């Protein structure tokens, strides 16, 4: 990171375990129902080039709970639709008084470009197929709450790994904290090359193997909107990779089930699993606000 530049959250890959643990510790103390004035007078701009429900709303709530003002800018309701460049949009937002920008963008690396040109924190809310750092952090917090540790855990991530920025952030994050990660899916959606993203990653195309003895099972949806040049047989996918109660039983008895959303019931998992006793899906949503409060406070309270 260049000198004189404010701290930003651009990805998990470049973070050290010390930084990750500090954010998780702070997030665990955050209470979304208790409003405070930590960021009073600050303005957080939510710049979303792609649709979002959980991420956008939880960042907005997190900022408001901390006392900040939020402004939402979407691609379809701004000059972006007229062809304005990312950098010019960033300059405009900064001139309006933004103290931080939370951005989701379809292009990998867009946040790094914006951070090079602006003197305010940039927070990555998802960039293409690259990373989704706040999701990785909230997943880690959810696992920590359920398991009290990371070291020695087997975490199976099942589904469309190739197109998933969530998977990439988790692959960078979880091994740093001592967990073993197994990626599982059909070859087109989980190619062997995914094991090269980080050290200690295993790739398997056999669901039974991936789930056997797992402490955490993370299901991912098939991102049909990104399936360019790749084919998937829905019936074959369901038969071989859908998480059912029977498949989940291959994991440890106290295993937890996670999903970043949106869920496609009947595709990557069944309703019995999504709504079952092992499910931590709603806990993930709740922890999203806590983690994003911690991110905003860490980056803005000191800038």
Swiss-Prot record:
GO molecular function: amino acid binding; aspartate carbamoyltransferase activity
Signal peptide range: none
Protein name listed in UniProt: Aspartate carbamoyltransferase catalytic subunit
Pathway membership: Pyrimidine metabolism; UMP biosynthesis via de novo pathway; (S)-dihydroorotate from bicarbonate: step 2/3
Transmembrane segments: none
Catalysis: reaction(s): carbamoyl phosphate + L-aspartate = N-carbamoyl-L-aspartate + phosphate + H(+)
Family per record: Belongs to the aspartate/ornithine carbamoyltransferase superfamily. ATCase family.
Annotated residues for binding of carbamoyl phosphate: 54-55, 104, 132, 135, 261-262
Record's function text: Catalyzes the condensation of carbamoyl phosphate and aspartate to form carbamoyl aspartate and inorganic phosphate, the committed step in the de novo pyrimidine nucleotide biosynthesis pathway.
Gene assigned in the entry: pyrB
EC number: 2.1.3.2
Binding, L-aspartate: 82, 165, 221
Assembly description: Heterododecamer (2C3:3R2) of six catalytic PyrB chains organized as two trimers (C3), and six regulatory PyrI chains organized as three dimers (R2).
């Amino acid at each position: 990171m260049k000198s004189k530049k404010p701290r930003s959250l651009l990805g998990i890959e470049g973070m050290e375990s010390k930084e990750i643990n500090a954010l998780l510790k702070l997030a665990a103390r955050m209470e979304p129902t208790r409003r405070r004035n930590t960021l009073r007078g600050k303005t957080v701009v939510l710049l979303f080039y792609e649709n979002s429900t959980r991420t956008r709303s939880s960042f907005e709530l997190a900022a408001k709970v901390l006392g900040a003002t939020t402004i939402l800018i979407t691609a379809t309701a701004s000059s972006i639709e007229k062809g304005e460049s990312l950098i010019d949009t960033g300059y405009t937002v900064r001139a309006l008084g933004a103290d931080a920008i939370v951005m989701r963008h379809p292009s990998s690396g867009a946040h790094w470009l914006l951070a090079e040109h602006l003197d305010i924190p940039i927070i990555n809310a998802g960039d293409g197929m690259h990373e989704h750092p706040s999701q990785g952090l909230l997943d880690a917090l959810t696992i920590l709450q359920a398991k009290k540790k990371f070291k020695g855990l087997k975490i199976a991530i099942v589904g469309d790994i190739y197109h998933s920025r969530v998977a990439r952030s988790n692959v960078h994050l979880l091994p740093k904290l001592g967990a073993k990660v197994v990626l599982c899916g059909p070859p087109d959606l989980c190619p062997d090359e995914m094991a090269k993203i980080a050290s200690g990653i295993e790739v398997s195309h056999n669901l039974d193997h991936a789930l056997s003895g797992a402490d955490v099972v993370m299901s991912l949806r098939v991102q049909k909107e990104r399936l360019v040049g790749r084919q998937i047989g829905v019936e074959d996918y369901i038969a071989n990779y859908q998480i059912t109660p029977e498949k989940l039983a291959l994991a440890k008895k106290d295993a937890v089930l996670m999903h970043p959303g949106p869920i496609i019931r009947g595709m990557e998992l069944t309703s019995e699993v999504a709504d079952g006793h092992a499910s931590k899906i709603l806990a993930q949503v709740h922890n999203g606000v806590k983690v994003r409060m911690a991110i905003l406070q860490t980056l803005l309270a000191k800038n």
